[in-house]
A protein has these predicted regions:
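C-terminal scaffold of the Radical SAM
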Residues: 1-229
Length: 229
């Protein structure tokens, strides 16, 4: 693959478990071996519990400040939901308070932030889903990725469904939630620029857009894949 590197994306797994030194080394390695455009988009995926925990042992005042110093200029944070019961149902490591605290801190240091929200969760009413979206918007986040809940085999959630303790996700509910999502985000200035992604102008993910435009990319690490055109 030849050409200038336009984006660097630390995907998951959970790359926020890496130390700052390790992340900085990986970024520098890209610069050492490839030509990189000026001011590339450099994204780090992270979970709220990691970010809140890392801030307690940050080298400077905040882990977010540390990330800025080593070259990260975009964060993708796996919020999933702001409701405690949803997070517990999905067996997430963070809680609602950590999700909000994480975004409060992140927005002090980063303008370019994306968060993930899950819809179609059993027991989630349309009103509750609207509250999730409203909470996300209240932080001034310029990009939201949203996906329907999928139930994987051999997970705690799947066991709860199989034993009848909770209902299975319903396609018609997920469809309603998606329509609510589109309407609310477009009303608030977001563009539905890709199947699961919504962004304000100048905040579309360059990395995601490159996939859809058929640009070449190199994947590095376990289960990573590349595309050479």
């Amino acid at each position: 693959i030849v050409g200038m590197v336009e984006t660097i994306y630390f995907g998951g797994g959970t790359p926020s478990v890496l130390t700052n030194t390790e992340i900085e080394f990986l970024i520098q390695t890209v610069y050492d071996h490839f030509e990189v455009i000026k001011n590339p988009e450099i994204t780090l995926e992270a979970n709220p519990d990691d970010l809140v925990g890392l801030s307690l042992r940050a080298e400077s005042r905040s882990i977010f400040e540390d990330y800025r110093k080593i070259g990260i200029n975009r964060l993708s944070i796996g919020i999933q939901s702001f409701f405690e019961e949803d997070l517990q149902l999905m067996n997430r490591a963070h809680n609602s308070a950590e999700a909000k605290k994480c975004l409060e801190e992140a927005t002090k240091y980063f303008d370019n932030i994306s968060l993930d929200l899950i819809y179609g969760i059993p027991g989630m009413s349309n009103e509750k889903w609207k509250q999730n979206i409203e909470t996300a918007l209240s932080f001034g986040i310029p990009h939201i990725s949203s996906y329907a809940l999928t139930v994987e085999p051999k997970t705690a959630l799947n066991k709860l469904i199989q034993t009848g303790k909770i209902a299975s996700p319903r396609d018609e509910v997920a469809e309603e939630h998606f329509q609510i999502l589109v309407e609310m985000l477009e009303k608030n200035g977001f563009v539905h620029y890709e199947l699961s992604n919504f962004g304000k102008e100048n905040y579309f993910s360059k990395n995601n857009s490159a996939y859809w435009l058929g640009k070449k990319y190199i994947g590095i690490g376990p289960s990573a894949h590349s595309y050479d055109g």
